[in-house]
């Protein structure tokens, strides 16, 4: 759970986004918040026995603090419930946790990054939540269909049209650097990049 402190509640709920990401991965069983015996937002509030009772193996939690007009500080911790300690520790044996300072429109990106940290820590495989997908839609016009190449967050949010054409397009593919897209087109040019 992520505890919010402030006057201006952001549109994006980090807990919901992280939960949805991890659920969609098919690798995690998530507990609904109404089954939590406690709701920590800081390490000193964690009572491991509460989480062991309901058979939780890992606990992700943090805070979202409003520190200015549309400015938020997000703090994220991940703990191993059965070992009774933070997942990440420094050489000095102190907990390593993550902190971001962002505007409200960047909270969804932070939630995707948190999801990636959790996924990697618990599975050993890098997460792909803070990535984008590309897809093509076809809209039926009054005379001819319109094809559109769209880029969106991995969960489908923040979709943006990057190309609209009356000629058919298909097979969008990311360049290895992840910054460019290639596609097959059936117009004047056989292929394109954007």
Positions of predicted regions on the chain:
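Short beta-strand->alpha-helix linker/helix-N-cap micro-motif
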Residues: 1-49, 60-66
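Envelope-exposed proteins and targeting segments
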Residues: 10, 14, 18, 24-27, ...
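Amphipathic beta-strand/beta-sheet edge segments enriched in Tyr/Trp
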Residues: 43-117
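Conserved beta-strand positions that form and line the central face of beta-propeller blades
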Residues: 50, 161-162
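Pro/Ala/Gly-rich low-complexity, hydrophilic intrinsically disordered segments
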Residues: 90-97, 107-148
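Surface loop/turn motifs at the tips and blade-to-blade linkers of beta-strand repeat domains
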Residues: 100, 162-167
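Conserved beta-propeller blade repeats
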Residues: 121-127, 166-184
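Beta-propeller blade-edge and WD-like acidic-aromatic loop motif
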Residues: 132, 141-161, 180, 184-194
